[in-house]
């Protein structure tokens, strides 16, 4: 079983991002961690600490609408086990309106999982045999608010996802 963690939208809250990531990554072995934008400088500030603490962890970042000053891509594709992933912030795909443009991107990439942020609203939706996962904002709103998303990929490439709350990781 492979494990992917997605977080998003730190908006300058570097310590909160660090606390969330270390708590969530410390729960179980993780293969990939993805930051979905709007705080890429925060990501850069903690990147080496995370890489040192979790050797072998693959770390990815995409830029959001508030990250124009960084050189990260708007959208990335990667594979975890037998599952194809795409990841973006979502502002260029109009995710605050609907997921239509992101669906087209996911179908084109033959993705089983599409990760996005931007809305600050945690959600997991299944369209066209693809999981569309928004982890919400790491800022959270109360102890039961989602701060991350966990995506599991089994040996056959089947995927499942859930949200992890601040309360669950003691934050």
Where are these regions (language model features)?
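Non-DNA-binding regulatory cores of transcription-related proteins
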Residues: 99-109
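N-terminal active-site segment of His-dependent metallophosphoesterases
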Residues: 1-54, 67-74, 145-147, 171
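Beta-strand-turn-beta hairpins that frame and shape the catalytic cleft
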Residues: 1-5, 77-86, 126-132, 153-163
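Active-site neighborhood of phospho(di)ester-bond hydrolases with catalytic His/Asp-centered motifs
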Residues: 6-8, 32-38, 60-65, 86-89, ...
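Helix-adjacent hinge/juxtasegments
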Residues: 54-97
